[in-house]
Amino acid sequence: MKAVCNAFFGFRAMGRLGRDKHFYDYVDDREDSGKNIKAIADYGLTHVPSYDNPFINYICLNSYPAHALPFYLRRENVELIKSRLDRIEVRHCDLLGLEGKFDFFNLSDIFEYMSGDAFLQNTAKLCELSNPGARALYYNMQNKRYFADSRLTLQKELSETLTNNNRAFFYRDCLVYVFGEQDEQSDP
């Protein structure tokens, strides 16, 4: 099993058969990427409940059974979601070209796909765009990218809880930073 995971989830195979090969241009530890993904998946598949996990069910069954619907598809959440749609402003764009001030950023795993210099530029721009107390959430999958800017404070306990209970089990870290708060700063 180890050899299969190392072969299939290694950057060479993933670049040919899965994700765009350029997604691996900036992976920190390319030679061990298969081993790293296997370790993350092993944890997720053995420590995170799978029966009602929408990600595992969709990956395995190509559908969501009724017992494993994501929150946004559950009937009991429809009215709540509808009532809060005005709170969300979706911007699909390059962070560096964005203008304005924001309270929350869901950055997914964008930092996987850029150079270290681009990461620093995007970090500076994020700080420029952040209102005091703004939060930024992002994932590390194969890279280990952490904000070093003193204006951004890692919410370590929350980040560890989210990482350890992340139902999208294939990420190394789920990180939450707050702009302008210095009470819980720590290095991962």
Predicted ranges, named:
Residues 93-106:
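A short acidic, Gly/Pro-enriched loop at the edge of an enzyme's catalytic core
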Residues 1-81:
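Class I S-adenosyl-L-methionine-dependent methyltransferase module
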Residues 158-188:
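Core SAM-dependent methyltransferase catalytic element
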Residues 119-132:
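A short glycine-rich, Lys/Arg-flanked "PGG" loop and its adjoining helix->strand segment in the class I
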Residues 108-111:
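Residues lining the SAM
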Residues 101, 114-119:
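Active-site-adjacent loop/helix micro-motif of nuclease/hydrolase catalytic cores
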Residues 132-144:
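Conserved beta-strand signature within the Rossmann-like core of class I S-adenosyl-L-methionine
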Residues 87-93:
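Conserved SAM-binding strand-loop segment of SAM-dependent methyltransferases
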